[in-house]
Amino acid sequence: TCYIDNDRNIIAEFGWLVRAWLYSGSWLISDIIAFHAPEVETTNLPEEPGITYIPMPAFSRAHAEWADYPFINSLGYFSSPEIAAIASYRCVLRTDCDCFLTPHFKNLNPRLTTFGAGQYAGEPEVVHRLAVIAERWGIKPVFNNIGSSVFGKVENIITYTNIHLEYCKRLLEEEFKDGIGKWPGWYKGVLSMYAGQLAAQSYFGLALNIGGLDVHCMCHDPIGSQDYHIHAWHSYEHFSKFNWRSGKYRDIDFKALNPLIIADYCLWIAGKGPE
């Protein structure tokens, strides 16, 4: 499941997710439940059996404190009654739109809730601050750089995501009243990532896996059997969603791509990009 904002880049990237879902054969064992801003015309979205579209106002528009933080929309829909649309499923992958399922996604069946990996807690300042907050909130910190994508039992992911939202609000109120900070140090721009790490350790403790999701799109290794889901990271290395958006892949010889290689697979699925 994912949220499609009324943004042409996100709408285009949702197309990547759908094409990868089809090519990888994931459509055989899963459905896509896509929540979207009401302004998004579903006639502009892929029509495939197994895809359900549910309109819902963006969380950032309905809650003034998040007006300048659209990333909250990828979580906010879990707090609405409409999330009941996923309740009949056993498991769910909560993902962003700018992602690619691999042919191995069909084999993902972990015993524990599985997260991807992030890259927001590399500076000592950030690691220390997260540990201090965890202690203040009564959380035992174990992991760092827990990713944004998560796969697990539906009821667990719904509960976890609502805790995640609550922690986003707490961080906003306690840590970012007087400024936004500066990347790669303590920075409001990745507040939802900090909150996700704290929420994961609060709710799951040690009973979680990290890996197999949010694989680096810039990797030039072959897709491994435990690479289930690739994320388009913020990078100008191939594969780069920024270069894709700006048309820098328009002249690429697609016949020369090797879709068994992670970076090439992403471009092969995404296509040449906008004119």
Predicted regions: what they are:
Residues T1-P70, P81-Y89:
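N-terminal anchoring/stem segment of glycosyltransferases
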Residues I72-E125:
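GT-A fold catalytic core of metal-dependent nucleotide-sugar glycosyltransferases
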Residues I33-A34, V92-D96, L101, A207-G212:
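A structural signal for short, well-ordered beta-strand segments and their strand-loop junctions
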Residues V127-K140:
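Short, flexible, basic/aromatic active-site loop/helix in glycosyltransferases
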Residues I10, E41-N44, F100-H104, T159-Y160, ...:
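Short catalytic/ligand-binding loop motif for oxyanion handling, primarily in non-cytosolic enzymes
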Residues V215-E275:
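Long, low-complexity C-terminal extensions of enzymes
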Residues K140-S235:
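Catalytic core and acceptor-binding pocket of nucleotide-sugar-dependent glycosyltransferases
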Residues A12-G15, R19, I72, G76, ...:
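A structural signal for well-ordered alpha-helical segments within the folded catalytic domains
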